[in-house]
Amino acid sequence: MKNGSPAVIWEDRLMFQRLIDDCVGCCELVTPQLLAAPFYRGSFGALIIPTGFANKEYSRVLPALRATKSRIKRFLESGGEILVFGGGGDIPDCYDWLPFSVGYHFEYGPREIVIRKESDTTNLLEGYDLSAFECDGYFTGYQGDPVASTPDGHPILIE
């Protein structure tokens, strides 16, 4: 996280947030209600959106992300960073709140992945068995460069 402390967007604290706290320091929790509040301004430099954010059965995050699309665009344009995990359901347009085009195909299960480009983001994959990496899908139609993909070319990590 280059630009300040991170924030996790979710309904309540997650075990995942504790891991971030342990690795990079204090991690702010931003609830969907807080995110969508018109005058809310966080003091974080990075946003983390966990797996399942688009699945209505588990999360109310996607409507809040869509409601704040223009603020997210300004956040990124001013140097903010964002790490978004899989939508967690068969919702191809679940990334439509991003200021660039990203398509998503839900297909949960382990798969072999190949590092296509060396970058700082490959650190996210260190220590995992790349022959059986758990994914909830892959990207279709995207702007950016694939960092890791399946052997048949389906990107699972883009930057």
Q: Can you say where each PLM-predicted feature lies in the sequence?
A:
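A short acidic, often aromatic-flanked loop/helix-cap motif at beta-alpha or helix-coil junctions
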Residues: L34-Y40, R111-R116, T121-T122, G153-I156
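Charged, low-complexity, helix/coiled-coil-prone segments
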Residues: V8-C23, L125-Y142
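Aromatic-Pro/Gly-enriched surface loop or interdomain linker
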Residues: M1-A46, P50
